[in-house]
Amino acid sequence: MENRNTFSWVKEQMTRSISVSIMIYVITQTSISNAYPIFAQQGYENPREATGRIVCANCHLASKPVDIEVPQAVLPDTVFEAVLRIPYDMQLKQVLANGKKGGLNVGAVLILPEGFELAPPDRISPELKEKIGNLSFQSYRPDKKNILVIGPVPGKKYSEIVFPILSPDPATKKDAYFLKYPIYVGGNRGRGQIYPDGSKSNNTVYNATSTGIVRKILRKEKGGYEISIVDASDGRQVIDTIPPGPELLVSEGESIKLDQPLTSNPNVGGFGQGDAEIVLQDPLRVQGLLFFFASVILAQVFLVLKKKQFEKVQLYEMNF
């Protein structure tokens, strides 16, 4: 009886341990796969440095273009679209974390003026919801609602990202004014080359850490290589580890120099940033402008009518 209870207890503990392990694995994998925007959020209080450089460029080293389109002017308390385009060749494949090839993902950060923020769901029209798709935006910080991040998301489906933005109303927000404001944006396609801790990803080129001769190249069981480099002058041996992904450019017996590329550069993506301007327009100014135009048109009409009346009087006097 005691042995049976002991067996049941051991079985219960094993089941519980396996369940916990599975949960930890799932949580860890989810965090890793969705961590790309989090890198900047965790490491930087503000994604835009004093120089104007967006911090995403610290990990995505290649430069690629992006395009941002916003209305020239908007009225207070109005929902409008900010459209970000991240162009790239859809046929390209990137190196994934496991060394295999796969489609490119994209991500973006949108830095709006103070007071502008993500539009609430009940203010977004059905047409705009259709343009947005299944994208889920989040604030860079709980207290920075004007800075939005998105990604990573599939590039083939979302190379054009539509942000639904709500403009502020100076009548209810004291820090909002009827002015021209700058908008900054950064967008990447593909994985980065550097992790926040400074280590390299497998989506970049690997260089030799020593001058010498390649004595041996060991192909690792899970992919990647270990390259033994021997210095001919003192016999010192250095081992460079290459993760799965980059293609090897050197062979055994080859003489190499310090910082010489050992692999190709597999990166096909890159990061770009841009800016635009938007005017928060005062409705009273718009009404005043419309009134002015109406007055000018009305004055022109009266002038034409007066001229025709004067011509008729002249013609009558000449006939008389």
Swiss-Prot record:
<keyword id="KW-0812">Transmembrane</keyword>
<dbReference type="GO" id="GO:0015979">
    <property type="term" value="P:photosynthesis"/>
</dbReference>
<dbReference type="InterPro" id="IPR036826">
    <property type="entry name" value="Cyt_f_lg_dom_sf"/>
</dbReference>
<keyword id="KW-0793">Thylakoid</keyword>
<dbReference type="InterPro" id="IPR024058">
    <property type="entry name" value="Cyt-f_TM"/>
</dbReference>
<feature type="transmembrane region" description="Helical">
    <location>
        <begin position="286"/>
        <end position="306"/>
    </location>
</feature>
<keyword id="KW-0150">Chloroplast</keyword>
<keyword id="KW-0249">Electron transport</keyword>
<keyword id="KW-1133">Transmembrane helix</keyword>
<dbReference type="InterPro" id="IPR011054">
    <property type="entry name" value="Rudment_hybrid_motif"/>
</dbReference>
<dbReference type="InterPro" id="IPR024094">
    <property type="entry name" value="Cyt_f_lg_dom"/>
</dbReference>
<dbReference type="Pfam" id="PF01333">
    <property type="entry name" value="Apocytochr_F_C"/>
</dbReference>
<keyword id="KW-0732">Signal</keyword>
<feature type="binding site" description="axial binding residue">
    <location>
        <position position="60"/>
    </location>
    <ligand>
        <name>heme</name>
    </ligand>
</feature>
<feature type="signal peptide">
    <location>
        <begin position="1"/>
        <end position="35"/>
    </location>
</feature>
<keyword id="KW-0813">Transport</keyword>
<comment type="similarity">
    <text>Belongs to the cytochrome f family.</text>
</comment>
<dbReference type="GO" id="GO:0009055">
    <property type="term" value="F:electron transfer activity"/>
</dbReference>
<protein>
    <recommendedName>
        <fullName>Cytochrome f</fullName>
    </recommendedName>
</protein>
<feature type="binding site" description="covalent">
    <location>
        <position position="56"/>
    </location>
    <ligand>
        <name>heme</name>
    </ligand>
</feature>
<keyword id="KW-0472">Membrane</keyword>
<keyword id="KW-0602">Photosynthesis</keyword>
<dbReference type="GO" id="GO:0005506">
    <property type="term" value="F:iron ion binding"/>
</dbReference>
<dbReference type="Pfam" id="PF16639">
    <property type="entry name" value="Apocytochr_F_N"/>
</dbReference>
<dbReference type="GO" id="GO:0020037">
    <property type="term" value="F:heme binding"/>
</dbReference>
<keyword id="KW-0479">Metal-binding</keyword>
<keyword id="KW-0408">Iron</keyword>
<dbReference type="InterPro" id="IPR002325">
    <property type="entry name" value="Cyt_f"/>
</dbReference>
<dbReference type="GO" id="GO:0009535">
    <property type="term" value="C:chloroplast thylakoid membrane"/>
</dbReference>
<feature type="binding site" description="axial binding residue">
    <location>
        <position position="36"/>
    </location>
    <ligand>
        <name>heme</name>
    </ligand>
</feature>
<comment type="subunit">
    <text>The 4 large subunits of the cytochrome b6-f complex are cytochrome b6, subunit IV (17 kDa polypeptide, petD), cytochrome f and the Rieske protein, while the 4 small subunits are PetG, PetL, PetM and PetN. The complex functions as a dimer.</text>
</comment>
<keyword id="KW-0934">Plastid</keyword>
<feature type="binding site" description="covalent">
    <location>
        <position position="59"/>
    </location>
    <ligand>
        <name>heme</name>
    </ligand>
</feature>
<comment type="function">
    <text>Component of the cytochrome b6-f complex, which mediates electron transfer between photosystem II (PSII) and photosystem I (PSI), cyclic electron flow around PSI, and state transitions.</text>
</comment>
<keyword id="KW-0349">Heme</keyword>
